[in-house]
């Protein structure tokens, strides 16, 4: 599946489900076996016509009727709660709250955030008379939800409030967070103070969960640490900007991965470490770079400070502009005192979007002039291993240093396709004269469910990197040590004008998965099994299947956030191979260490933890939706990845647009069989 870009943590492809659509097999297919009908586990009659339904990351099934929004226990088939005030909402008005198990429902004048398992309302915008929600952040370590909002005109000052995740009780509300901590100035200085305060009230807070007892926030008026239980300010700090008194811009907060006594704060062109206990700066002065700070990477040999190219009219200092791009400079700071390993920042062409850790080095991805360049940074010496940056197609997605050099895979962007190649570190030249390439560039639509078809799908087994290239529809094997590649077998053409959206290694061979195709390929490139199921005529029918990946991603985000802010930031930010270590640590903590998704109601935490453990197993099947054999209605098939045969099937009836939902973690399908009747099938 197309990997979700994050800077420090990429969930392994084995943990991200490939879900797709397609029944009535055609084309090059093996002898078909008759799938067994799915077993109806329960039947439930709702109060009113069922409009839509959706599975939540926590495991509850939300069902909407004109009368109410209800939750159904998927194991027992029983309604666990109802909310009449949320009846008749369109499906897009009920959404997951990122990095949590919670859901939110919105309608004009109302925002509700609730626990889908217990039905507890954690936040109701009417309680504080809020007209606008500026910031909302779930903090599972302290079991809270932080909300920052602005009231209706005349309704009072902006407020920051904290709510208990389990009960919805308000722990505290703070209306003084945006007040100036400096003495009140007169004249122009006072005007500037008031302007900064007004802007701060309308700007989303930077929030960091610093353990179970402390929350650190940044507003335009400064850095504040709040007691998570009472909301009392423990300490405040003013960021040391280049010109004293100027508010810091582009502020980001980072947890320390290895030193629990501190946090890191980047702002403008600099970085500072602060002691959590009292907010004291741990370094004499902040290390600086050229450009804005885009992010940091905490490498064992130092903190890599990634630069971002500012707009030319906002650049400060000694500005260098080439071809309309403001040039930048990267540096590496020491953990002990913040001093930089080299005096002058290393010159970069533009924004360094990523630094993928590879042993003692980091592979840099640089965005300049709408093109991507790569280089290799030796972190301990803060030097570049390539004499000049190497331009690649697309955007960097995967990189590793091998005996042959820098092996990389890119992903397509709106203008360029993707490629696989190896860069010789001595010469700086690519080893493959004709790189392995994908087909068309990605169209640029983030809502395109089939965007993954434009990527180069790959899988590693031992010293071999398998790559499927949609450019010529062939499977390639790259020797990671020798830096060579060869084509395996002949062209693998999918039917229905499709390309694979995922590939994985299984005992039977390599499996190529597309919305309506599944192909099992031997390791020598020979096709063992291939099936194709024509798509239903209405694309909207596939929405429930496309949602499966979002549900899994939501569950992983909640697990990462509950385990710690370092994992939460990693899951939000990154794309590199070092994140396998973090992901493995996270999985081990929940499966062997007995960790729970803390902070939520016990019932919700237990159910979500059980689902998270179950989700770690790579699914052995995919779901495909297709037209019924007689052409009247639709059928959902569960296709085995190893045999390419249907395991089970469910007839979705004769409706043009059946109302159904699938939970691949629990192995269930939920179908409206009559206007007010819901049936749960065990697959």
Set out the residue ranges of the language-model regions:
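N-terminal secretory signal peptides that target proteins for export/translocation
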Residues: 1-6
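Secretory-pathway ectodomains
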Residues: 25-683
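Bacterial N-terminal signal peptides
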Residues: 8-20
């Amino acid at each position: 599946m197309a990997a979700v870009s994050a800077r420090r943590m990429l969930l392994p492809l084995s943990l991200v489900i490939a879900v797709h659509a397609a029944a009535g097999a055609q084309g090059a297919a093996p002898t078909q076996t008759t799938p067994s009908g799915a077993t109806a586990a329960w039947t439930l009659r709702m109060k009113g016509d069922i409009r839509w339904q959706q599975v939540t990351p926590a495991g509850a099934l939300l069902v909407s009727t004109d009368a109410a929004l209800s939750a159904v226990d998927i194991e027992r088939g029983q309604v666990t709660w109802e909310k009449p005030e949320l009846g008749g909402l369109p499906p897009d008005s009920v959404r997951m709250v990122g990095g949590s198990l919670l859901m939110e429902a919105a309608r004009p004048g109302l925002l509700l955030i609730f626990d889908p398992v217990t039905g507890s309302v954690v936040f109701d915008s009417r309680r504080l008379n809020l007209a606008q929600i500026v910031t909302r952040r779930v903090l599972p370590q302290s079991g809270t939800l932080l909300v920052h909002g602005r009231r209706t005109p005349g309704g009072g000052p902006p407020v920051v409030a904290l709510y208990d995740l389990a009960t919805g009780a308000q722990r505290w509300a703070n209306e003084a967070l945006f007040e100036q901590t400096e003495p009140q100035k007169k004249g122009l200085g006072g005007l500037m103070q008031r302007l900064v305060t007004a802007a701060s009230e309308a700007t989303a807070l930077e929030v960091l969960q610093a353990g179970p007892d402390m929350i650190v926030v940044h507003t335009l008026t400064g850095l504040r640490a709040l007691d998570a239980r009472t909301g009392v300010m423990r300490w405040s700090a003013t960021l040391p900007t280049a010109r004293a008194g100027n508010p810091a811009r582009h502020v980001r907060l980072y947890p320390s991965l290895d030193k629990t006594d501190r946090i890191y704060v980047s702002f403008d062109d600099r970085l500072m470490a602060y002691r959590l206990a009292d907010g004291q700066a741990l370094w004499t002065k902040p290390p600086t770079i050229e450009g804005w700070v885009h992010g940091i990477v905490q490498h064992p040999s130092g903190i890599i400070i990634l630069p971002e190219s500012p707009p030319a009219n906002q650049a400060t200092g000694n500005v260098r502009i080439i071809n309309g791009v403001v040039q930048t400079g990267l540096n590496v700071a020491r953990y002990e005192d913040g001093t930089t390993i080299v005096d002058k920042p290393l010159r970069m062409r533009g924004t360094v979007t990523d630094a993928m850790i590879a042993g003692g080095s980091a592979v840099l991805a640089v965005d300049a002039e709408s093109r991507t360049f790569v280089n290799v940074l030796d972190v301990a010496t803060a030097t570049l291993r390539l004499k000049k940056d190497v331009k690649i197609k697309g955007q960097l997605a995967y990189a590793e240093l091998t005996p042959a050099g820098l092996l990389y895979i890119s992903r397509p962007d709106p203008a360029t396709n993707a490629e696989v190649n190896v860069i010789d570190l001595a010469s700086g030249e690519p080893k493959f004269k004709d790189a392995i390439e994908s087909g068309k560039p990605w169209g640029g639509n983030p809502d395109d469910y089939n965007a993954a078809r434009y990527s180069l799908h790959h899988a590693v087994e031992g010293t071999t990197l398998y790559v499927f290239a949609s450019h010529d529809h062939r499977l390639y094997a790259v020797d990671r040590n020798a830096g060579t590649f060869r084509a395996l077998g002949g062209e693998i053409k999918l039917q229905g004008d499709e390309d694979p959206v995922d590939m994985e290694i299984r005992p039977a061979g390599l499996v190529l998965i597309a919305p309506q195709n599944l192909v099992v390929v031997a390791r020598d490139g020979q096709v063992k099994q291939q099936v194709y199921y024509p798509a239903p005529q209405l694309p909207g029918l596939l929405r429930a299947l496309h949602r499966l990946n979002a549900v899994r991603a939501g569950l992983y985000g909640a697990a990462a956030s509950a385990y710690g802010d370092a994992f939460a930031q990693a899951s939000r930010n990154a794309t590199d191979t070092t994140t396998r270590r973090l992901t493995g640590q996270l999985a081990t903590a929940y499966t062997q260490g007995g960790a729970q998704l803390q902070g939520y109601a016990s019932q919700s935490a237990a159910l979500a933890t059980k689902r998270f453990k179950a989700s770690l197993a790579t699914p052995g099947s995919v779901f495909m939706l297709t037209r019924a054999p007689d052409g009247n209605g639709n059928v959902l098939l569960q296709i085995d990845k190893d045999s390419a045969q249907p395991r089970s099937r469910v007839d979705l009836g004769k409706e043009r647009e059946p109302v159904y939902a699938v939970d691949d973690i629990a192995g269930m399908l939920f179908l409206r069989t009559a206007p007010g009747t819901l049936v749960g099938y065990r697959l």
